[in-house]
Amino acid sequence: MSLPVVALVGRPNVGKSTIFNRIINSRVAIVEDKAGVTRDRIYARAEWMGHEFILIDTGGITLDSGEIEEQIKAQAEIAIDEADVIVMLGDVTQHMTNMDETIAKMLYRTKKPVILAINKADNPEQRTDIYDFYSLGLGDPIPVSGSHGTGMGDLLDAIVGEFGDKANQHEDGSIRFSVIGRPNVGKSSLVNAILGEQRVIVSNIEGTTRDAIDTTFTNDGQKYTIVDTAGIRRRGKVYEKTEKYSVLRAISAIEESDITLLVLDASTGIREQDKHVAGYAHDAGRGVIIVVNKWDLPKKDSRSMKDFEDTIRREFQYLDYAPIIFVSAKTGQRVPDILKLVKEVHENQTRRIQSSVLNDLLLEATRITPTPLVNGKRLRIYYMTQVAVTPPTFVVFVNDPELLHFSYQRFLINQLRQNFDFVGTPIKILARKRK
């Protein structure tokens, strides 16, 4: 399912990051009372009244010609291009400015739904001052206060009201997998090798894949869909006009997938950006397969594969469940095994365990390692049941959810992995108080 994308845009210092944090209930974005502090797009999953969406916080759009200002403008333009709904923010304390008018004209030309929200309306008097913004031609402005939280319900109602059918698109029954990684690790070549034909532009120049490509095919009676991306640019680079891909595009591909192939370059080793990409895949709760490409290039001895695998496990400790496969898209080495792994991981991430079996496991697990004491109070787990797949999600009913420490939660996850085949998929355990 493809999640709707919502972009927060506006001139600097109107409070976009504060609104962003208020919506996602977190302080992911840096909030500082200084224009231009949010330079890169920041994105997170958000939810309102059962509607999930991807929220983007952008740097303020300016007309200044400095390098940083140009980067901010480029980032915002890409966010606007990718968005299904755009929220333009104004600042009631600074009233409407010429810059607001310029941004409104730019947004009007996109032909996309635009919601006008006026921030910093912290008291009744300020809420009546928003009417200057009617002249922007973007409809009724919604007064909000990012710092106090007032008006946020009205804003979120307006946002989800624009989603239409976007949030209700269903998959066609195929196993969908995305191919992600930083530029030039060989994603396009790998897709070509899997498909056995040229379907996308391939060259050694970063970002030569010009648009998103979803390709559906059948292998051994199983239908697959590849969601291909052009990788993730290094932070701080200005995007070229023809470059449509970004961190957001990779996240969108992950969200639309059941499984993600995280592609690493054997010839260059693991870089910091690889870790960022891996984090997106893990956080989305999708299945993950680590594909080490270009294995034909590095000079190797008999231990090099083991050494590289050890490095991966050390650098990506949170992906300890992900299988690793070493391939060469150029020579075709082990490429046929990728689809076998995709099918296996899909079976694992959709696996359901009967409650009676789970509770037998729980009884044995708590016997091996008793539940902990927290401030003199012992955690009591009454029973466990599976409530979802993709990823497999389990609920334990307890006397007090606050007593389930992450270390004991990790112990229970390890017990599940030891007893059932969950290779390639994360596992979630939620605690609920027994009524």
UniProtKB/Swiss-Prot annotation:
Q: Which GO terms describe its biological process?
A: ribosome biogenesis
Domain named KH-like is located at 351-435
- Similarity-based family: Belongs to the TRAFAC class TrmE-Era-EngA-EngB-Septin-like GTPase superfamily. EngA (Der) GTPase family.
> What domain of life does the native source organism fall in?
Bacteria
Keyword Kinase appears in the UniProt entry = no
The record's listing under CDD domains reads:
EngA1 (cd01894), EngA2 (cd01895)
Domain EngA-type G: from-to ranges: 4-167, 175-350
Keywords, ordered alphabetically: GTP-binding, Nucleotide-binding, Repeat, Ribosome biogenesis
Q: What does this protein do?
A: GTPase that plays an essential role in the late steps of ribosome biogenesis.
UniProt source species: Lactobacillus johnsonii (strain CNCM I-12250 / La1 / NCC 533)
Subunit info here reads: Associates with the 50S ribosomal subunit.
The answer to keyword Nucleotide-binding applying to this record is: yes
Q: What is this protein called?
A: GTPase Der
Where do the TM regions start and end? none
Binding locations of GTP 1: 10-17, 57-61, 119-122
Q: Which PANTHER family match?
A: GTPASE DER
Q: Binding of GTP 2: at which residues?
A: 181-188, 228-232, 293-296
Which GO molecular function terms does the record list? GTP binding; ribosome binding
Q: Which Pfam families match?
A: KH_dom-like, MMR_HSR1
